[in-house]
Amino acid sequence: MRYTVITLFPNLVRPWLEESLLKKALERGLIRVEVVDLRAFGLGRHRTVDDTPYGGGAGMVIRPDVAVAALERALPADEVVLLSPAGRPFTQKVAEELAGKEHLVLLAGRYEGFDARVEAFATRILSIGDYVLMGGEVAALAVLEATARLVPGVIGDPQSHREDSFVRGLLDYPQYTRPPEFRGLRVPEVLLSGHHQEVERWRRQEALRRTLALRPELVARAPLSLLEARLLAEMDREE
């Protein structure tokens, strides 16, 4: 899978690719990432990339001619993703859709964002949350990492991402490791029992419990299994 990240601050992006599983995926050729400096497409001697907004207002806006020149250099691409707080929510489902593509272009803005005409050249406008950052680099890296980890071979155990939060519509169950007791807090006995069916039941139950506590809106639209539906009914009766 190939990525092109277009940004005014390439040195914010490159270090992220030099650690952990992304670094290994790049070394093994499972993914390719090109980081494009938007300023290289700037105008004039000073490589100007932005201008004041028509109609007045604070801040500067990235010019469409500069942004599209950088974008067209990266084409062809399966998807052109513009990162913006005004975009549609980036979810695990969207990550799975994008992970099936061969080439993604990620447009990371700055200042007051891109001239609105740049949106005509994007296939998707995505947001990673209802808040505003100083730029789109963090959002672009979130999309890159969430999709790259779904590429076969990037994560050693494919079961890992099949059990992730949101994959089945619920949050993940709580995870524990050694020691079995820490400052009076014990690992649930069922996890030490070696009884695989009971462990699976406990995990489903705790995933439901955690989702109800932290993200109750997810439960209403999650495709619950028969076991999960029974566990949910039991929890309702307990209350």
Swiss-Prot record:
UniProtKB keywords: Cytoplasm, Methyltransferase, S-adenosyl-L-methionine, Transferase, tRNA processing
Role description: Specifically methylates guanosine-37 in various tRNAs.
Q: Which reaction does it catalyse?
A: guanosine(37) in tRNA + S-adenosyl-L-methionine = N(1)-methylguanosine(37) in tRNA + S-adenosyl-L-homocysteine + H(+)
Cite the SUPFAM superfamilies for this sequence: alpha/beta knot
Q: Which Gene3D superfamilies match?
A: 3.40.1280.10, tRNA(m1g37)methyltransferase, domain 2 (1.10.1270.20)
Molecular function (GO) terms for this protein are: tRNA (guanine(37)-N1)-methyltransferase activity
Q: What is its EC number?
A: 2.1.1.228
The record's Gene Ontology biological-process terms are: tRNA N1-guanine methylation
Descriptive protein name: tRNA (guanine-N(1)-)-methyltransferase
Q: Where, in this chain's numbering, is S-adenosyl-L-methionine bound? A: 109, 128-133
Q: At the top level of its lineage, which domain of life is listed? A: Bacteria
Q: Name one GO cellular component term.
A: cytosol
What HAMAP family does the entry give? TrmD
